[in-house]
Each structure stands twice: as structure tokens, then as C-alpha cells.
Amino acid sequence: MKILFIMRNQAYVRNYESTIKDLANRGHDLKVVFNDYKDNDRLIERLNSEYQQINYSYEKIPDRCDEWSTLVKLIRALKDYLRYLYPEYIKAKKLRKRIEKHLGIIMVACLQGLRWLPKQLGVEPLTGLIEIIEKIIPEDKAIIRFLEQENPDLVLVTPLLDFDSVQTDYLKCANKLGIKCGLCVHSWDNLTSKGVIHVEPDRIFVWNKIQKQEAIDFHRISADKVIVTGAQCYDKWFERNTSTSLESFIERVGLEVGKNYLLYLCSSGFIAPQEFGFVQELLQQMRNAEHPQIRALGLLVRPHPQNAQQWDNIDLSAWNNTVIWPPGGQNPVTEESKANFYDSIYHSVAVVGVNTSAMIESGILGKPVYSILDPRFKDTQAGTLHFHHLVRGGLLQLSHSIEEYIQQLILRLEGKRDQEGEQIRQFIYEFVRPYGLDTPCTPILVKSIEAMADLPSVAVAPLPFWGVCLRVFLLPIALIVKESEYLYRKVEGKINQLFVEPLSRKLS
């Protein structure tokens, strides 16, 4: 098969490295293209040099810029916002504010009345209307031409669920051309923390039964289209072993030899933009603890690669046996960076953090994983749905204060929490490797992708007469919306400057 894999940027290659390699090894031709250019470790270039079947282009793929583009963005942003008015998202304040930025304060103000209406009278009818308009709006001609030129047998996209993602239009155009298309769900939080699926792909590949239910419940996808394959991106950690001894590792990173250490895993900028104050409080209580093992415990702070700049000018030398490593953060994509990541988890006595996917990887290595509920992060801990998967699944042990956490850690160091290991294994089985802890997920995903070749081709039904009439009616509206976007943003900016920002300053 000739496969076109559309990714947001190069950073997304990491989670599909094994998948791309396996597809190439099985004789498929792949071309990886990107919505945006992001200078990074250039993993795709290395894959291209190793496999002649793997090609790529850094040239930005066509965006939707036709007369319908502004209206399309508006209705999709509106539908994305509506999901955050459901009861499941009542605590998701920060997630809701993120999508509100795409709609603008004027539109958000107009929608506030929906909060007080039963969903059958407000959110659901409006969602249905948006879905009708989505079907009425034609495909983008530039994207159609691009797909015709590439002429793939199959289109894969990831992550799709970003707000204002052009990948939706690629699905829409692929459907029009009769090209089968699949969504590869990139991460554990994608189906609940971002936008919704606006155009239904032929297949959606998810990690586990939890994500499958999310696709059905939150995105209205037919169950037979959602395929559970496991988390292929974590296969490499099951196959790996440590590259160095504990003593050598501790000496290399700059901790005190002969003492154990705790690993603090930093989170993304959205989840925890500033963690230094929190880490400082943790250190203070560790160093002042009555228990000698806690006082002596080292702390390795591992910066998140997308939020490492917060540590650039931080000096922890005043705290003994504490390091920030690796400085500047590190994405585990090269052999060296993978070893660094693995070893930092492997040699630690336990892992703690706010809310990050590295907690799952720590569970794969059998490490106890902790999170301290803190008011600074309440909107990105309890205020997200995906955080609760780790708690309910048995991976994450919560505490409501640093003091409570230290007591948990004491029990761990004294060997009184032996039941943790079985809970962690059960979580990894259910969430990461649902076909068995010894069964790699990459071959399952690859075979599921290959099986799409046997799906029957379904022609897109032509618009009925009323649909054609509605399209004619909508076109001038689309043109007006496109022409008035600049004015709308200007007015919104003034309102923000004169009223919203001063009020926010007063409240803070």
C-alpha cells in the first residue's frame, strides 16, 4: 500500500516510530507530511536514511484558505466548545478557557445561556445543526488537488483533535475521493482534553477499552470503527534494559553516590507552567523531615522537553543532593536520550509529578508513581478527565499535601507497600497492553492498518436538493464571515483591553 501519514509536526513521529518502521519492513511505501514545521531531533530524517520505503516532506501541506475557511473554523470551534458544557466537564475550567480563546469573548458571552438549558434543548440541537452545516460545506479544492497528486491508497492522521486542525479537511477530502482514512490517537488524553472529531474516519486506533468508550461517548463514533490496538509508542520500554549501574548513573548526573533518589517528572507548560515553587516546597519538607531516609533522599528533577525553559535560570545547588537533569530537557528519540530517560526512572526509588505521560512509562518499569493534589494545579489534575484514568486504574497514588505524600513515601521505603506492584501491573495490562504484558502492540496496530485495505469503498452520497439550496444560502454568509473576521478580532481586542484585562487584574 501507498500510505500518506499526516502529522501536526515532527514531534509526533516519536510515538509512531515503531509503526512506521514495521509498515516499511512489510513492504508498504510511506510518506510523512506535516501541518507545521517544528525544528527538532529530525527523527523522520533518520528513518528516511534507514528505509527506502519511508519518505517525508517538510514543506507545509496546504491549509484551507477558500471562501468557506473562516465559517468552517467558526462552526468547528463552536462544536469543540459545546462539549465543555456537558456535566462531565464541569470542573474542566482550564480546558474550557483554552477553547474559549479560539471562539473569542463575544461568541463565548453569547453562548453562556446554554449552560442553564437542558442539553436536549440547547447543546444537542446546536450540535446537530453544526453537523448539518459541516456536511453542506464543500471540500477544499486545494486539498483535493494535493491528495490527487499524492494518490495514496490510505491516509492516516494524528492527532486530528487539535482545535482548528486542518487535518479534518484532509479526512473530508479523502472521503470525497474514496480514499480510506484512519485516525491514530496519539496520546492518552487526546480524546477528552482537546476538540471533537468533526469528520468520521473509516477507522480510529486507540490504546484500550477506556479510549474506545471515549470515542463512542464523546465523539459519537460507531463502535465497529474503533479498534483497540494497545499503546504501540511504549513497546520500546518493554524491550529495554538499563545501560548503566546505579552508582555510575548517580555519579554522572551529579547526585550523591551511595544514596537513593526520588525522580520528579515535570509536566507540560499547559499542565504546570511553573513548578519551581512547588518543587522548592517539596525539597524543604524532605530536608526537614524527621525520618532519616527521607532527609537523605536525593531529588532528580527531569524537565519536560516542551517546558524546560522554566528551569533555565534556576539554581538548586543550595539544596544538597539535588539536580536538574538533563538540563534543557530531552525528548527520548535518540539512543542516548532513550537510555537517559529509561535509566533515570529505572534507578529511582519512586516517581512523583503533577500530571504527565511519563508516569505511565514509570509504571511500565514497575515504579511506584505519586501525585500531590495542589491548588496551583487543580484545573489540570482533577479538572481533566484523563488524570482520573491513572487514579482509578491503580497506577497513581494521590496525596492532598506534601506531608501526606512523605508519609506514603516512608511506607514505601520501609517496604510496607508491597501491594503496589500488582496494582501497577494490572493498570499497565488494561491501559497499555490489553492483549497481554508480553504482547507488543506495534504489530497489532500495523495489521489493523493493513486490514483497512479490505474495507469496502463507500461513495460519498451527493447532496440532496435541499442541501444544495442550503449551500447556496450559506455561501454569502461564509463570505461575510470571512471579510468581517479582521473587524471582529479588532473589536474583541478592544473589549479585552478596556474591560476584561482590567477586571482580571482587580480580581487577581
Residue spans for each PLM region:
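Short N-terminal targeting/anchoring amphipathic segment
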Residues: K2-L4, K94, R98-I99, I144-D164, ...
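A short, glycine/small-residue-rich beta-strand->loop->alpha-helix junction that serves as a flexible
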Residues: F5-E17, L160-F163, F270-Q274
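Conserved N-terminal ligand/cofactor-binding loop architecture of enzyme catalytic domains
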Residues: A11, H28-I144, E148-Q149, A478-S508
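Active-site-proximal region of nucleotide-activated glycan assembly enzymes
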Residues: Y51-I54, I130-E134, P138, L154, ...
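Donor nucleotide-activated moiety binding/catalytic core segment of transferases
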Residues: E148, Q306-A358, L365
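Catalytic binding pocket for nucleotide-activated donors in carbohydrate/polymer assembly enzymes
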Residues: H198-P201, I221-A223, V228, S357-P434
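Conserved catalytic-core segment of nucleotide-activated headgroup transferases in glycan assembly
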Residues: Y234-N331
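C-terminal amphipathic helix plus adjacent low-complexity
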Residues: T242, C266-F270, Q397-S508
